[in-house]
Amino acid sequence: MTDRVSAGNLRVARVLYDFVNNEALPGTDINPNSFWSGVAKVVADLTPQNQSLLNSRDELQAQIDKWHRHRVIEPFDVDAYRQFLIDIGYLLPEPDDFTISTSGVDDEITMTAGPQLVVPVLNARFALNAANARWGSLYDALYGTDTIPETEGAEKGSEYNKIRGDKVIAYARKFMDQAVPLASDSWTNATGVSIFDGQLQIAIGTNSTGLASPEKFVGYNRQLRSSNWSVLLANHGLHIEVLIDPESPIGKTDPVGIKDVILESAITTIMDFEDSVTAVDADDKVRGYRNWLGLNKGDLTEEVNKDGKTFTRVLNADRSYTTPDGGELTLPGRSLLFVRNVGHLTTSDAILVDGGDGQEKEVFEGIIDAVFTGLAAIHGLKTGEANGPLTNSRTGSIYIVKPKMHGPAEVAFTCELFSRVEDVLGLPQGTLKVGIMDEERRTTLNLKACIKAAADRVVFINTGFLDRTGDEIHTSMEAGPMIRKGAMKNSTWIKAYEDANVDIGLAAGFKGKAQIGKGMWAMTELMADMVEQKIGQPKAGATTAWVPSPTAATLHAMHYHQVDVAAVQQELTGQRRATVDQLLTIPLAKELAWAPEEIREEVDNDCQSILGYVVRWVDQGIGCSKVPDIHNVALMEDRATLRISSQLLANWLRHGVITSEDVRASLERMAPLVDQQNAEDPAYRPMAPNFDDSIAFLAAQELILSGAQQPNGYTEPILHRRRREFKAQNR
């Protein structure tokens, strides 16, 4: 039984109550009694609204299911379908043109285009690494990944390989020629760097040149009479620091003495309480809240053991430079932090209230996330003995990403929640900013209205292909069998969805005011492919896009030097490339022309992916990790990838493409493979051969067989219940 404390009509888990009173409230000038009474009133007032919104989701889905079932043998009529969605209030009138009015937003959001990390907040080491990923070594990122091929003697090996190192240096020089070109010649031929009369001078043998754009030299860092120094350059609002040390092992091999090129990388980072974490009870939630508090105070630390050495990882300090005219320049040493709360669906046992029937019920998790992440973030707005040495926002804002909202009424509810939380926390109205995840179909179709509902709070919109595809499948579950998962990326609605997000954001005045983001690169080991392909996102007008690691952030940062996103947005402003009918194009299989082996391949791929993710989620509480696919390619998996895989199989099951026996047989084939892929993990519990004794195996099976009945196809209800079951059995 969870130990609880009564706070008014709230029954608060002791672990949460003590954390709030002893750790989070000190330094905020908020009276504990006033705080808890305020929380109780917010919960009491907003719970009915939250439930009403969920009821609306279910009612709309039931009407859509019925419409499709009555027309399953008829050709799809987009005109009739569009009118039906209008009639039931799913597709709403588009509001008149407007411009967002959000104020007090940091430059990282309004002015700087660059990568965005997403990291599970429950893992302190990951969180620290991500916060510190504002700056990253290009040399390390190139040397340690497949961006540099292991051919022509350039293998990584266990010792430093000079052949590979030379290729890294050559690659970096070519990049510098693109981002900060010289007035004449190339960085490749440079033999020295110096500063003369406030200008950067680059020696090319006996000759000398400067930068093609001298204003890109913005600073340097040099100790008196030291050969170890650095040059700070800027391009498209991003910084490049060239480290020079002729005595270093790498610098000795370089004609200029350059030992590394440091790129400003993860400009912003989302600390995630949602899809990448397993927070199923009060203990889990408090672990996340405590890490978030430590990030805002600047005192989060973690003991790390690397190469047999133990050290304490801390948050990086800001970086100081001398400007060309002798002034001082300070740049942030850390990524600007967002926090992603959960959506409107889930509840948490961290706080219980009277359900009205004599039974206690859990409160909506999204409500308490707003309260407690907002409370912790107050410490990131100021420094002091009780607030820590570092700040997050320099403009007094707290940035909260709100996922899985369906339509403008749900966005408006989030804004009302934030306003009420500001009152409880004694914050000025508008302090809590919102990032809108455009990852549900009803939000996509009504995006302009969604943005208008948060016009004075919104700081980003972001597309999320995987969750959005999961909702696409579930919304039209009764329409017929869907195309295969791999074909979804080429479907009509996807391109319309990506284009519409950018165009509507720009029309609402996002340029220079808010982020327009795009989705995650999931193939964590395939960085060469990422470098080749992910440049398409800034080319599409996105000011940020998600990356899975600090290394990926550094490599993706190159794209924002190669593409002037502001210029792209200027060109796109005023366009409306997608139509509603394109967005309404359901990705149905035209005919069931798949061979039996193709069906089996899809089912096996999806079952393996589901098992590989769910077994770590349920058994070990790992919500985001590199999961090998059926071909042993490491993919970054979270609940969004699980949603699409489980929903596709549920759809095929619903329409007779496969049977429940096919699902079970595939799961039993794939479980031994997943067991083998995890054989090196001492904490891993095999699922085979006693499948029905494995809670994780049963969870994976349930996600597929019951997928059509899950609210909007979400995986949280089953995952949370199964994880709690596992924890109860293994206390």
UniProtKB/Swiss-Prot annotation:
Cysteine sulfenic acid (-SOH): modified positions: C624
Binding-site positions, glyoxylate: R340, E439, G464, F465, L466, D467
Provenance organism: Mycobacterium leprae (strain Br4923)
NCBIfam families: malate_syn_G, PRK02999.1
Co-factor requirement: Mg(2+)
HAMAP family given in the database record: Malate_synth_G
Keyword Metal-binding carried by entry: yes
Entry EC no(s): 2.3.3.9
Known role: Involved in the glycolate utilization. Catalyzes the condensation and subsequent hydrolysis of acetyl-coenzyme A (acetyl-CoA) and glyoxylate to form malate and CoA.
Database matches in CDD domains: malate_synt_G
GO biological process terms, semicolon-separated: glyoxylate catabolic process; glyoxylate cycle; tricarboxylic acid cycle
Protein name, UniProt field: Malate synthase G
Pathway listed: Carbohydrate metabolism; glyoxylate cycle; (S)-malate from isocitrate: step 2/2
